[in-house]
């Protein structure tokens, strides 16, 4: 219904409160303790699909995406990534309306994207790696494609590689802030935002700077970046 549903992922089980009919749904998809939830619309039907990212038992072993497609109720298993260095950041990087399988490799700050539009592998070095940057992929220029982005924790600086508008950099935040990029002013572009001890600091593309108190120190802000 184009509305985000309240949901939690617990030890391989999904608990979802569906906004369309206010009914509760529970479904098992994933392994207890080891999987990371990576829900996204992988098949382009307008509904988020249940999906998990699973690391291997040993360093340098392959990682896998396990996706339950909502359109066909079929499973997609995709080996993609390496244990110990890669983190999953699926999003629609090619603008075809489907989330692409993607990882950010801390060894070198390299993005690897499996584009759903043509099944081609795209690689791009953007970021320092070695856990110095927090990946923050979002659509910052409003062209319908997710842009590569990192938040450099040491300086509070944002570095964006926008698919249409090109490179951009901005200092916004301090080293202890949590990045919370999202479209806070409704213009179709993600805005820069950080959360600091219960205060949201936003740099909005239309409305400019704003600071709002909501939450307590130690809270996890939503939206947040994994």
Regions found by a protein language model. Give the residues of each.
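Trp/Gly-enriched beta-strand/coil motifs that build multi-repeat beta-propeller-like domains
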Residues: 1-226
């Amino acid at each position: 219904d184009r509305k985000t549903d309240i949901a939690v992922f617990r030890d391989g089980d999904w608990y979802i409160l569906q906004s369309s009919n206010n009914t509760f749904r529970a479904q098992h998809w994933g392994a207890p303790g080891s999987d990371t939830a990576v829900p996204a619309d992988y098949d382009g039907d307008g509904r988020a699909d249940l999906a998990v990212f699973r690391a291997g038992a040993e360093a340098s072993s392959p990682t896998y995406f396990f996706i339950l497609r909502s359109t066909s109720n079929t499973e997609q298993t995709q080996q993609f990534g390496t244990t110990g260095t890669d983190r999953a950041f699926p999003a629609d990087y090619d603008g075809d309306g489907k989330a692409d399988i993607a990882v950010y490799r801390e060894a070198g700050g390299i993005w690897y994207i499996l584009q759903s539009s043509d099944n081609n592998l795209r690689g791009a070095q953007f970021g320092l790696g070695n856990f110095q940057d927090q990946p923050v992929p979002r659509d910052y220029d409003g062209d319908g494609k997710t842009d590569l982005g990192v938040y450099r924790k040491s300086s509070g600086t944002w570095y964006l590689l926008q698919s249409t508008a090109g490179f951009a950099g901005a200092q916004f935040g301090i080293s202890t802030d949590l990045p919370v990029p999202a479209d806070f002013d409704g213009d179709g572009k993600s805005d820069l935002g950080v959360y600091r001890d219960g205060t949201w600091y936003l740099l909005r593309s239309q409305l400019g700077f704003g600071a709002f108190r909501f939450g307590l120190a130690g809270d996890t802000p939503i939206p947040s970046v994994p």
